């Protein structure tokens, strides 16, 4: 009897652990159907070397982070001459002279000495068929980002935080980099105190990507706008990309939130932009942006001029009826508080949504409260 009781307790404990590390929900939008590591037995890395190995091997894996993996000082530091194109005040970011960027593009900027952590400059390689998931709020990668490139596909990143990547130094590293990938779901991820981009999709095709329920925290001691508001938020620049952004909290930024160009179809739905010191969207040539059901609170300029791509900003109930033809439903109005205008209504590109997996949309009325409380590594 006692043996049976102990076995039952052990079984219950194992079941509880399994439940705690399983993926929550499923991807909406363009990355619908992504499975990551699927039913692979979960592994719990204990060291940064084990984490790098698990993420970079060729096995389907479910990788559970149950603590902070701190890469700071793991690859040494570099001291060299950089530049200060935004000024030398204590709150200003300065730039590493990566690929002679200072020399070629900022020749008149003051030269400054920079000392940065080498680990941050290039993210951890993540190969195909991986689920990377945090256990509660414990899963943190500090001082180094994630890098998915060169054909990687079928990846889920959920309920983790990526923090403290050379925050003083532009070109010091990105939190999440995608370039030439397909079927990637970034969900309930917090990014904070990042050198450059919180999320960047490079110039090669990134195909089907969903970014959901994530917290882009732009609050920092250093910024390119020298005001504590991070400029380098989200950059979508792929040559054939379909990106769903849903339920994200984009906070305390000053630009590129997101910057969209290349050949990118973006569906931005039920996101909450809050407390921006300048502008949110930059919509360049080759951008096709549908924005609906979002909330913009204290965003002085919602979209920077000029808008060179195409934008349907869901400006009115009558205008939004056109969405029924292409999305199978009307689009939701956006909500604004102490923010600039956002009313462009290009419609020719909406046909690009036909036959695609489209995220659902709720009214903006409940977005601010629900997103602010649930976005990021809160599972």
From Swiss-Prot:
<protein>
    <recommendedName>
        <fullName>Pectin lyase A</fullName>
        <ecNumber>4.2.2.10</ecNumber>
    </recommendedName>
</protein>
<feature type="disulfide bond">
    <location>
        <begin position="92"/>
        <end position="226"/>
    </location>
</feature>
<keyword id="KW-0624">Polysaccharide degradation</keyword>
<keyword id="KW-0964">Secreted</keyword>
<feature type="disulfide bond">
    <location>
        <begin position="83"/>
        <end position="102"/>
    </location>
</feature>
<feature type="active site">
    <location>
        <position position="256"/>
    </location>
</feature>
<dbReference type="GO" id="GO:0045490">
    <property type="term" value="P:pectin catabolic process"/>
</dbReference>
<feature type="disulfide bond">
    <location>
        <begin position="323"/>
        <end position="331"/>
    </location>
</feature>
<dbReference type="GO" id="GO:0071555">
    <property type="term" value="P:cell wall organization"/>
</dbReference>
<dbReference type="Pfam" id="PF00544">
    <property type="entry name" value="Pectate_lyase_4"/>
</dbReference>
<dbReference type="GO" id="GO:0005576">
    <property type="term" value="C:extracellular region"/>
</dbReference>
<comment type="function">
    <text>Pectinolytic enzymes consist of four classes of enzymes: pectin lyase, polygalacturonase, pectin methylesterase and rhamnogalacturonase. Among pectinolytic enzymes, pectin lyase is the most important in depolymerization of pectin, since it cleaves internal glycosidic bonds of highly methylated pectins.</text>
</comment>
<keyword id="KW-0732">Signal</keyword>
<keyword id="KW-0456">Lyase</keyword>
<dbReference type="InterPro" id="IPR011050">
    <property type="entry name" value="Pectin_lyase_fold/virulence"/>
</dbReference>
<dbReference type="GO" id="GO:0030570">
    <property type="term" value="F:pectate lyase activity"/>
</dbReference>
<keyword id="KW-1015">Disulfide bond</keyword>
<dbReference type="InterPro" id="IPR012334">
    <property type="entry name" value="Pectin_lyas_fold"/>
</dbReference>
<keyword id="KW-0119">Carbohydrate metabolism</keyword>
<keyword id="KW-0961">Cell wall biogenesis/degradation</keyword>
<dbReference type="InterPro" id="IPR002022">
    <property type="entry name" value="Pec_lyase"/>
</dbReference>
<dbReference type="GO" id="GO:0047490">
    <property type="term" value="F:pectin lyase activity"/>
</dbReference>
<feature type="signal peptide">
    <location>
        <begin position="1"/>
        <end position="20"/>
    </location>
</feature>
<dbReference type="InterPro" id="IPR045032">
    <property type="entry name" value="PEL"/>
</dbReference>
<comment type="similarity">
    <text>Belongs to the polysaccharide lyase 1 family.</text>
</comment>
